């Protein structure tokens, strides 16, 4: 399989709400292509939705580093920090996102079962 086909497969897993499965497929792609923002974003989102918050934080921070003008990445990082009960730190990133014209995100429904973590 090509990298593109692997990415497409991971996207199918993500769309099917198998976020942990998508993350497993995306992690090696991100390691091989560290500057690819699309891969990094989908990986961070997969980590976030599968409640792998430490990994999501790292991935969103990397995304912010890769694209410092991406207000959505700042908002996503703020959401991740809030889920980790780091509200003061999240406020800084939320303010950056709002300064870039990004409205605060709506609450995200996160469903996680033991099967997702297998």
Question: Which ranges hold each PLM region?
Answer:
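Register position in tetratricopeptide repeats
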Residues: 15-16, 49, 83-84, 100
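Conserved structural position within tetratricopeptide repeats
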Residues: 28-31, 61-65, 98-99
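Canonical tetratricopeptide repeat
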Residues: 42, 76, 110-111
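Alpha-helical segment of the N-proximal tetratricopeptide repeat
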Residues: 2-32
